[in-house]
């Protein structure tokens, strides 16, 4: 998505450890008009996927997910993060390891919000090692729902998350695919196709 | 806002301790179309307030705040919650006590996202004792920005948050004002004006 790539080049900052900081428009300060454009793009990409519900993880996934939900007119459920989980009778839970923070969290959603006939689109702001997506897969499996696809705002294709989703045979659409960092420069997969 | 009140009556559940559970459309599962209608209503209510930025607190405030931001075409910043705060040089922080959870959290936002000429609209999903709003007031004061108003999705007018905002002389607009719970029945301020 050209508009997003341009914004990353303009406002993103590359930090040591191949971390891209985009807190100016995506995950701390949010640009709602850009989010809406992204939601519309997700709706377009998954228009034939029979999506009945969108699932994401708090907090950074919420803005892109609700905009996709607005464009697709389907409900959005955001999984809650906890240090630990108690009283889990009414919850589907999964453990998610964060490579950035080097800690484990549990994510959970109330069972009543996933029905067996749901076709669920998973949305998240970043795809790196795919731990959050894997946690959402686990929750979907426990709920016996069909996964309609995975929609990612910014994907680092050189990390392991991409393969994890491919191995599962689930369709992945990322609005910006970063192939490499070169010092503080960001390279996108779209550069190759444009060349 | 009639549509919101009807949804509360249909899907809300009153729990002991005057807690209204609305996890079916507001703070766990989200109805994006209703959120957009609410965002449009906030934009209408504050159209003459000169709003340059919206501030909210993760996670439940994000969906209504980004929809208001979409309708007003202004950026949205969501404050992060932490158990404790370290490395605060670049952050504005405030302590927020939760009466529901009986714990204190710190909220923070990066200093660079509040400029002295900003006129900030504070948005949150619930107003009860007003602790989150008070935390946002504190952050705005530290940043020397003007507070353009407070927009709340569901207000419990019989708790102390309403007065806290009135005492500060800040304009408050709530899309649903709950005056009392009567067993599992919810009463709105609009019932009085309609009578």
Swiss-Prot record, chains A, B:
It is found in: Cytoplasm. NCBIfam families: PRK09219.1, XPRTase. Homodimer. Pathway: Purine metabolism; XMP biosynthesis via salvage pathway; XMP from xanthine: step 1/1. Its EC number is 2.4.2.22. InterPro entries: PRibTrfase_dom (IPR000836), PRTase-like (IPR029057), Pur/Pyrimidine_PRTase (IPR050118), Xanthine_PRibTrfase (IPR010079). Belongs to the purine/pyrimidine phosphoribosyltransferase family. Xpt subfamily. Its main location: cytoplasm. This is Xanthine phosphoribosyltransferase. The keyword Cell inner membrane does not apply. Converts the preformed base xanthine, a product of nucleic acid breakdown, to xanthosine 5'-monophosphate (XMP), so it can be reused for RNA or DNA synthesis. It comes from Lactiplantibacillus plantarum (strain ATCC BAA-793 / NCIMB 8826 / WCFS1) (Lactobacillus plantarum). Keywords: Cytoplasm, Glycosyltransferase, Purine salvage, Transferase. One of its GO terms (molecular function) is xanthine phosphoribosyltransferase activity. The keyword Cytoplasm applies. Xanthine binds at residues 20, 27, 156. 5-phospho-alpha-D-ribose 1-diphosphate binds at residues 128-132. HAMAP family: XPRTase. GO terms for biological process: purine ribonucleoside salvage; xanthine metabolic process; XMP salvage. SUPFAM superfamilies: PRTase-like (SSF53271). It comes from the Bacteria. It catalyses: XMP + diphosphate = xanthine + 5-phospho-alpha-D-ribose 1-diphosphate. GO terms for cellular component: cytoplasm.
């Amino acid at each position: 998505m050209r508009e997003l790539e341009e914004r990353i080049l303009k406002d993103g900052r590359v930090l040591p450890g191949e971390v891209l900081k985009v807190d100016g428009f995506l995950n701390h300060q949010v640009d709602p008009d850009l989010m809406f454009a992204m939601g519309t793009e997700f709706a377009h990409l998954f228009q034939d996927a029979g999506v009945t519900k969108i699932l994401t993880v708090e907090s950074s996934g919420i803005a892109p997910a609700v905009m996709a939900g607005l464009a697709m007119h389907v409900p959005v459920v955001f999984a809650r993060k906890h240090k630990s989980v108690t009283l889990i009778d009414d919850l589907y839970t999964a453990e998610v390891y964060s490579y950035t923070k080097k800690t484990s969290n549990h994510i959970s959603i109330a069972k009543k919000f996933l029905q067996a006939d749901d076709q669920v689109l998973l949305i998240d702001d970043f795809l790196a090692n795919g731990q959050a997506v894997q946690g959402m897969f686990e929750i979907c499996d426990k709920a016996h729902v069909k996964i309609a696809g995975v929609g990612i705002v910014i994907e680092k294709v050189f990390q392991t998350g991409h393969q994890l989703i491919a191995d599962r045979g689930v369709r992945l659409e990322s609005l910006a695919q970063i192939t490499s960092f070169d010092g503080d420069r960001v390279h996108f997969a779209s550069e190759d196709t444009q060349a």
